[in-house]
Amino acid sequence: MNVVGYGGGTDSTAMLVGLWRHHVPVDLILFADPGAEQPHTYAYLDTMSRWLENHGMPAITRVWYTEKNGQRLTLEQECLRSGTLPSIAYGYKKCSLKHKVAPQEKFCRHYQPCIDAWEKGEKVVKFIGYDAGEERRLLNALPHDLQDKKYQKEYPLMEWGWSRKDCIQAIRDAGLPLPGKSSCFFCPSMKR
């Protein structure tokens, strides 16, 4: 069972293109929607969905954070409710964990092919789109990855040696426009 966490940006788009080019099977593509992505990211989902369909890959499944009562809670609603900025403004990544990682994990916990893999004692392969210039991110993730009993994390862009420049070229070679920076429109760490 192979799962892609798709963020709608350059790295994860290039990763999907590369997985297709390398004939790596993809069973599930998840986009965790915090409800506050840049408008161009939402528009790009349609572009990428058409490309995926034309290349025989699965559709993008959108997931989001829900409260215990089942109601969707966007990151913006959470910030307005608490009267604070996103946690990244204070040096934490709680917003990504809560609104990106947790909804994907919750979906997989209830997704029968993942359940079947775990019941057989297998790990679900989760592809992460860190390009070859992001070794620090990989090193930070490794201790958690090694302890993870449910997922085998793989970093194909690093495995292929794809730099940011290579990712951009792969997207262009696939006939796709560049996606633009994906981030919440009010993220304090957003770069231009």
Which functions belong to the PLM regions below?
Residues 1-192:
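Nucleotide-activated chemistry modules centered on ATP-dependent adenylation/adenylyltransferase
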